[in-house]
């Protein structure tokens, strides 16, 4: 699947989210995954976005909450709910060391590069 196949509103929202992320985090890559990437979404679906971060592995909860705040700003601006998942580059490159390796393998297989 290609990014071109994503609905324009979702693409605009994920672009806005990426811009906000870049102001606060050292982002390596971002991926859309889940139902929107598979085109199985429904009216209440959110946009699952994996955010691969450079640098040392940080505190997941603190990072997740900070990204959630940015996603909320995007929700207010666009009406699109983004659910960010922070992943550090060393976890991305070595999924077996991640608490849920199958999730990372799934994102690597089905995710759309944003």
Predicted regions and their residues:
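Catalytic core of pol beta-like nucleotidyltransferases
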Residues: 1-28, 37-43, 54-114
């Amino acid at each position: 699947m290609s990014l071109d196949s994503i609905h324009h509103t979702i693409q605009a929202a994920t672009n806005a989210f990426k811009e906000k992320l870049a102001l606060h985090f050292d982002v390596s890559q971002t991926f859309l995954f889940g139902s929107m990437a598979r085109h199985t979404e429904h009216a209440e679906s959110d946009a699952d976005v994996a955010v691969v971060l450079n640098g040392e592995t940080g505190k997941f909860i603190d990072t997740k909450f900070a990204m959630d705040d940015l996603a909320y700003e995007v929700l207010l601006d666009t009406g699109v709910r983004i659910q960010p998942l922070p992943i550090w580059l060393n976890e991305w490159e070595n999924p077996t060391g991640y608490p849920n390796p199958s999730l990372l393998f799934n994102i690597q297989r089905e995710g759309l590069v944003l």
